[in-house]
Design a protein with these regions (language model features):
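PLP-dependent amino-acid enzyme catalytic core
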Residues: 1-476
Length: 476
C-alpha cells in the first residue's frame, strides 16, 4: 500500500518529517560533537559516546497514542526504507534519508510463546524473541543496518576514498558486518574482521569468508582482538563496527521497540532476559525503552534481567558486590558472550544508576544450565542458540530464586540461530563436549539416529506401530 493510500485511511501522516539535530554526546564529560564525523570515543576525555538528537523533544508534538498508531500502520506501507528497523526511523538515525537506508530483511523477528510443557519446566509462561531469524542469523544485523546505513549516507555526502570497515568478533558481529558491507559498492569499502583463532564455530567462520571479507585469526580471546581493533581505530582511518561505535547501538534499540509493539505497547509488567557479552545489546535495549517512555509511547519501563555464564560474568559480579573488575574468561558454550571486559559496561552502569536502579538485575548461570536449557527449549518448537539457552536458563533460575515475580510477562532474547551452534548440540549428543566447559550430557536430552532395515514391516515393528483395523463396510 502506498503512503497516500494508507494516509487516506489512517488520517495521519505516516512518512518521516522530523528535522533532527544529531550529535555524539560524551557519557563522561558531556561534550557534544557533530555526527558527520567518524568518532568512537570522546576526543577530550576518551569516554564512550552515545548518539543524541538535540531536537528529540520536537517529537512530543505527537502524543504517545499517535506514535503508536504511526508505528503500527507503517507495517502496511510499501516503502523499502521503512520495512526493517527503520520503521522506527525517528528513533534510530533520523538524519539518514530513506534512500540511503540499507535494508537486507532485518528486524521484526517473531515473538514465540513457550508451549505448556516448556513453560511448566521454566516456572512461568514466557516468550522467545528469535533474533536468529535476521539475515546473518543474529541480532547483530540490527546494529549493522543502522551502522551501514549511516556509512552509506556518509559516503554519499562526504565522498571519501575507500573506507575500511573493521570489527573484532566472537562470530556473530563478523558475519553481520561482512554481510552488510558486501552490499555497498566494492570500490567504496573494504571489509576486515578479527577473530580469536579456534574460538568461533565453523559456521560463524564461514559466514564472513562467504561475504568476501578479509578474515584475520588472532591468538587469544575476543578481548585480545578488541584491543587490536581499538588501536587501529585510534591511529588509522577505519570505520569501527563493534558496539563501541554508537551508531550501531541506534539500530539495536529496535529490539526494544519491537518487543513493546508485540506486547501491545505495555511493558511495565514485562521482564526481558538478555544474555550479556560485550554489553552493547543490553545497553541498546535499555536506551530503546527509555526513548519510548520519553515520548509517552509506553507508560513505564520493563525489568531487564542480564544473564551471564559463570565463566564470563563481570557484570553479574558488579551487580552483586557493587564493584566492577574485568576478568579472565574460561571457555564457554555461549561463545558470543565469552567476554571478560565488556566495552559498553560504562553505559550499562550509567543507565542502571539513572533509570533502571530497581528494574535491572544480572544473574549467573552454569555452563551445564546453558546447554541443558538450549537442548530442552529446542525440543519444544524453538531454534535458540547457546546464548538463547543462557537467557532462558537465567529466567528459570531467577524465577526459582524469587528474583523476579511470577505474575508478570517474560521475554527471552535468543540472539542467534541454533544452526550457528550445531556443533555444540552434536558434541552434547555424543558426550564429547570439551572438559573445560564442565558439561555432562543428560540421557533424557540426548538424541541419536537409529538404524533400521529398509523394510516397512521392520520399521513399523521398531516404532511400535499397531496394524490398522480393516473396514468391513460395503461400498458402491
Amino acid at each position: 500500500m502506498t503512503p497516500q493510500e494508507l494516509a487516506a485511511i489512517a488520517t495521519i501522516d505516516l512518512m518521516p518529517r522530523h528535522e533532527p539535530r544529531m550529535v555524539y554526546r560524551c557519557i563522561g564529560c558531556g561534550k557534544s560533537f557533530e555526527l558527520e564525523r567518524l568518532l568512537y570515543t570522546c576526543p577530550h576525555c576518551r569516554a564512550l559516546l552515545r548518539v543524541e538528537d538535540e531536537n528529540f523533544d520536537a517529537l512530543k508534538s505527537r502524543s504517545g497514542a499517535q506514535w503508536r498508531k504511526v508505528f503500527d500502520l507503517r507495517r502496511a506501507l510499501d516503502v523499502e526504507g521503512l520495512k526493517g528497523i527503520f520503521l522506527f526511523h525517528e528513533l534510530i538515525l533520523p538524519h539518514v534519508p530513506l534512500a540511503d537506508v540499507v535494508y537486507l530483511g532485518e528486524g521484526h523477528t517473531p515473538l514465540v510463546r513457550a508451549n505448556r510443557d516448556l513453560a511448566q519446566w521454566a516456572g512461568a509462561d514466557f516468550f522467545v524473541k528469535n533474533d536468529g531469524q535476521n539475515p546473518s542469523a543474529s541480532f547483530k544485523d540490527r546494529g549493522m543496518a543502522s551502522a551501514i546505513s549511516f556509512l552509506n549516507h556518509y559516503i554519499r555526502v562526504k565522498k571519501p576514498e575507500t573506507i575500511l570497515g573493521i570489527c573484532a568478533s566472537t562470530g556473530d558481529t563478523s558475519a553481520a558486518a561482512a554481510l552488510y558491507l558486501s552490499y555497498l559498492p566494492k570500490g567504496a569499502v573494504r571489509s576486515v574482521v578479527l577473530l580469536p583463532k579456534g574460538k568461533v564455530t565453523p559456521q560463524q567462520l564461514g559466514q564472513p569468508l562467504g561475504s568476501g571479507a578479509t578474515v584475520v585469526e588472532v591468538p587469544g580471546v575476543f578481548d585480545d582482538c578488541m584491543k587490536i581493533v581499538e588501536q587501529l581505530t585510534e591511529n588509522y582511518e577505519v570505520f569501527l563496527l563493534n558496539s563501541k561505535n554508537p551508531v550501531r547501538i541506534c539500530g539495536q534499540k529496535s529490539f526494544a521497540f519491537e518487543v513493546a509493539q508485540q506486547m501491545g505497547w505495555k511493558v511495565d509488567d514485562v521482564t526481558v532476559a538478555v544474555p550479556i557479552g560485550n554489553a552493547g545489546n543490553v545497553t541498546a535495549i535499555m536506551e530503546g525503552f527509555i526513548d519510548l517512555l520519553r515520548l509517552g509511547i509506553v507508560e513505564g519501563l520493563p525489568r531487564v534481567l542480564g544473564v551471564q555464564s559463570h565463566h564470563a560474568n563481570p557484570v553479574a559480579i558488579w551487580k552483586e558486590i557493587g564493584r566492577y573488575t574485568p576478568m579472565t574468561v574460561s571457555p564457554s558454550v555461549a561463545q558470543a558472550a565469552m567476554i571478560g571486559n565488556p566495552v559498553s559496561f560504562p553505559k550499562v552502569k550509567g543507565l542502571v544508576e539513572e533509570h533502571f536502579r530497581d528494574r535491572f538485575d544480572c544473574i549467573t548461570v552454569t555452563e551445564q544450565e546453558i546447554m541443558d536449557s538450549m537442548m530442552r527449549v529446542n525440543r519444544h518448537g524453538h531454534v535458540v542458540c547457546t546464548q538463547g539457552g543462557e537467557a532462558v536458563a537465567g529466567l528459570r533460575k531467577a524465577l526459582a530464586e524469587g528474583r523476579v515475580a511470577k505474575g508478570g510477562r517474560f521475554v527471552c532474547d535468543s540472539t542467534s540461530h541454533q544452526l550457528k551452534f550445531a556443533g555444540f548440540q552434536d558434541a552434547y549428543f555424543e558426550g564429547k563436549l570439551e572438559e573445560g566447559y564442565g558439561v555432562v550430557s543428560k540421557p533424557e536430552l540426548v538424541n541419536r539416529p537409529v538404524s533400521m532395515a529398509a523394510d516397512a514391516a521392520a520399521i513399523a515393528a521398531g516404532l511400535g506401530l499397531k496394524p490398522r483395523k480393516r473396514c468391513m463396510c460395503g461400498g458402491n
